[in-house]
Every structure is written in C-alpha cells, then in structure tokens.
C-alpha cells in the first residue's frame, strides 16, 4: 500500500510542509528509515537525526519543521499521530469465521457464526463468544465466561472461569485471567484455602500483555475499567480495581483489594501494597513501592537511581548509619541548649 503525504494529512488533520505528493509505503525510525518510508520526531534528543534521515516523510511539531530536509507532516502530538498512521500499515492476518475441527466446545456454549475459533481451543459450559471474536490456537475459555464482540485472544490465553471481557479486548499469549486469588487463612498452624467465589470483569478496549495474571475476586469481582492497558508479566491480585485509561508497565505487582484510579501510569517493576487507594491521574515511577494510599494527583517515586558501584556502596553504608547519626545530632543540639 502506498499513500501520499497529502492523503495522510487529510485523514488525520495534519499540515503538510513540502511536497504533498510524496508517497510512503511503510514506517521506520529516523535512524533506519529509507526511501518511501515515514518516520516521526517527538523526543528532542533525536532532533539531530533529522539532518541525516532518509525518511521520505517525517511527522513532527511545528517548531521542528524547518529542520526537516524533506516532506514533513506537522502535528500537535507527533507520537500519537504516528501511532495512528502506523496502524494503516499494520496488515494483520485476516481470520476467517469458523471453528477449527480440533476445537472442543461444550454443547451449552454459544459461539457467534462470525467468530474465528482456532486449533486446539477449548470452550467450557455456558460460555459465550461474540461477533467477530478471534480465539487463538490453544486458548482455553472455562465455564461461565463471556467474550464480547470484536475481542481477540491470541495463542494460549486462559480464561479460567467467571471472566467477562468487554468489546474489542485484546489479550496476548500466555496470559491467565480468572485464576484463584491468593486467599489463605491460618488454622491450627496450617493454611486453609479461602474459596475465590468472584470473577473478573474487563471493560471495553482493554489490552492485556503476554504472561500477565489477573486473579478473580474472593467475593466481589476483580475489575479493569475501559481502556486499561497492561504490559507483560504483570500480577493483578484478587479484588483489585483499575480505573479507566490507566496503563501498567511490565513486572508490576498489585496486591489484593488495591484500588487504582483513572488515568494513572505505573512504571516497570512497581509494587503496590494491598487494601490501599490511589486517586486519579497519579504517575508512579519505575521500581517504586507504594505502601500508603495516595490522595493527590502527581508523580511519585521511591526507587534509587543508578550510580556507579563504588558510590552506591558508600551511600548504602551511610544509609545504615542514618539513625545513629540523627541521634548524635539531636544529642549535640540538646547539649548546646
């Protein structure tokens, strides 16, 4: 597929600077783009690459347009504009409606005639798969699950039981949704299992990364509201609620019954203690541990920035002495009084 700069600009409300008849047939980074490819500039650190890029068209801000040596498309937010343009060239394989001969479907399950059910899929009792859904190879849909219209489970996704997916949900390989929450009680020196009687509800337009686990609730449902984006290898425990339009980066763990607000961003390897609340529009930077509820929007951090090993060892040794040093300072202050 080939598109002119003018056609792209018209479709996405951009402004052409240069030759609007320039054609592109793909996308690439500034450093690796070649003839006939479109790229973008959103981070100022890559601005020097404009002088050398071979990209036919570059999406950028108005104040960077003069530095572009070829055709430019001016956007208020170049990265978002690029994401929309790149989708035009993302030619995903077409999945024809139908049920593969190797699939095993319970007689009480309902599968839309327009859905695609791939090889070695299992669909349990009373579950429903909606119009235009794609159920990838080896995926398992347990009992009493709902997969609403336009949703896609890639290979080896497991919906254990009582999982309800909204419309246009996309779940990547290896994810497990609706497994038992980690509910235990100590009885006479031995653990006993607390039954997990709730489910999982995932709203419209959510995306769940590979090998992520979202446990079902103990009594109430674990809930992801609409347009939540979850990266790979994330653990969301039972009874959590993730607010709409929030994004959670890889290797983050959220303990049970935590409540995350709307439009929140959690960086990689964040830990969230259970039974707390984070308000809307909070950013948690990578490696942070959230031990208390957050009631004010803003950016929060608790991780230690990288430094050379020698400096880190000195700082770590001094950190261990903080309490002793603080007591000495207080003692000196009292002596002077």
Curated annotation (Swiss-Prot):
Catalysis performed (reactions): a UDP-3-O-[(3R)-3-hydroxyacyl]-alpha-D-glucosamine + a (3R)-hydroxyacyl-[ACP] = a UDP-2-N,3-O-bis[(3R)-3-hydroxyacyl]-alpha-D-glucosamine + holo-[ACP] + H(+)
Database matches in CDD domains: LbH_LpxD
GO MF annotations in UniProt: N-acyltransferase activity
SUPFAM superfamilies, per database record: Trimeric LpxA-like enzymes
Keywords, alphabetical: Acyltransferase, Lipid A biosynthesis, Lipid biosynthesis, Lipid metabolism, Repeat, Transferase
A family per Pfam: Hexapep_2
EC number: 2.3.1.191
A GO CC term assigned to this protein in UniProt: membrane
Swiss-Prot/TrEMBL GO biological process terms: lipid A biosynthetic process
The protein's annotated pathway: Bacterial outer membrane biogenesis; LPS lipid A biosynthesis
InterPro entries reported in the protein's UniProt record: Hexapep, LpxD, Trimer_LpxA-like_sf, UDP_GlcNAc_AcTrfase_non-rep
Active site: 238 (proton acceptor)
Family, per entry: Belongs to the transferase hexapeptide repeat family. LpxD subfamily.
Purpose: Catalyzes the N-acylation of UDP-3-O-acylglucosamine using 3-hydroxyacyl-ACP as the acyl donor. Is involved in the biosynthesis of lipid A, a phosphorylated glycolipid that anchors the lipopolysaccharide to the outer membrane of the cell.
Subunit composition and interactions: Homotrimer.
Name of the protein in question: UDP-3-O-acylglucosamine N-acyltransferase
Gene encoding the protein: lpxD
